[in-house]
Design a protein with these regions (language model features):
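N-terminal type II signal-anchor transmembrane helix
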Residues: 1-24
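N-terminal hydrophobic or amphipathic segments with adjacent small-residue motifs
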Residues: 4-6, 26, 170, 279
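Short, flexible segments with low predicted structural confidence
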Residues: 9-12, 81-82, 236-237, 267-268
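Signal peptide-directed extracytoplasmic domains
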Residues: 17-167
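Bacterial extracytoplasmic/cell-wall-associated proteins, especially those involved in peptidoglycan
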Residues: 108, 112-305
Length: 305
């Protein structure tokens, strides 16, 4: 090693200079590839001249195991030290993919967006990686490397959720509900109401119904049951044998029906305190609340003619 280091230091520009025969290209560094494989691949692509020189520089810097996988774009020839720096910092040279997931998006819907933005990721791959975390993939705008895979995208979204939920830790603890129940409730609220005030009202009503042992009777679960963005349930649907059918089964559904935003999570943790047990959205676009079924029916006749 000392002899090799001396050769590199003595050779100076000769050993660190880019090779002849360079052409603009993309080079894919596979996840888990050894420093030997990476060095040889770059040499074969005429990005570097001497594989051993790259290995020695990375070893001297303590970066042999810090090479970042992904697709690197080389537009102009670069010296060895610049190439080493790019490998370690993940400077891919390719504009990142910008992708936005809206509040209330399901993993199934996210998978379609990811597949459209990343040719190398199928909707099935993303669904498999993301489905166990339905409700915990925070809806937001993200920037990802073009070489990102389903697992890394899911990991970034989960990390964002964990960071965002910290702002509600006190409210969640004070609510007396588990994080799991809060997320499930928030996913229902996300689909049932739009404004912050309405979300807090709906959350309060649904918690009230749970406390009284009443079925939640939330219509939005049927979109999740049937895998559709929107769905108006029929009388037959109200009897469909699904654990997510909140007409047929009391209590919260077994899991979230979408990935809620922070507004809905906050509403679930800190709902409005009322005696209401019913709500509906009228043709006037407003929500109307009732304490009794008779009042609810009156609202139905008045606002849903």
């Amino acid at each position: 090693m000392l002899v090799a280091l001396g050769v590199i230091l003595g050779g100076g520009y000769v050993l660190t200079a880019p090779p002849s025969g360079f052409s603009s290209q993309d080079v894919v560094i596979a996840r888990g590839a050894s420093v030997f494989a990476v060095a040889q691949e770059l040499a074969d692509a005429h990005i570097i001249a001497y594989p051993m020189a790259l290995r020695i520089v990375l070893r001297i810097e303590g970066n042999e195991n810090r090479i970042r996988a992904g697709t690197y774009r080389f537009v102009t020839s670069e010296n060895l030290l610049a190439v080493c720096d790019r490998l370690v910092t993940g400077a891919y040279g390719i504009p990142p993919v910008r992708i936005t997931f809206f509040e209330g998006t399901t993993v199934r819907e996210m998978a379609a967006r990811v597949a459209a933005a990343f040719p190398g990721i199928s909707a099935a791959d993303f669904s498999a990686a993301g489905h166990p975390y339905e409700g915990y993939l925070f809806p937001d705008t993200y920037l990802f490397s073009t070489s990102a895979d389903a697992a890394s995208i899911v990991a970034a979204m989960r990390a964002n959720f964990n960071a965002k939920i910290q702002s509600l830790s006190g409210e969640i603890q004070a609510s007396g509900h588990s994080l799991s129940d809060i997320v499930i409730m928030a996913s229902l609220v996300e689909k049932e109401a739009r404004s912050s005030g309405a979300k807090r009202m709906v959350a309060g009503i649904l918690w009230n119904r749970l406390q009284r042992g009443m079925p939640l009777q939330v219509d939005s679960v049927f979109g999740y049951i049937y895998g559709r963005s929107t769905y108006a349930p029929s009388l037959a649907d109200l009897r469909v044998n699904s654990p997510y059918n909140t007409y047929l089964h009391k209590g919260l559904p077994p899991g979230p029906i979408d990935n809620p935003g922070l507004d809905s999570l906050e509403a679930a943790a800190n709902p409005a305190k009322t005696n209401y047990l019913y709500y509906l959205t009228g043709t006037d676009g407003r929500m109307h609340y009732a304490m009794t079924y008779a009042e609810h029916e009156a609202n139905r006749r008045k606002y849903l003619p």
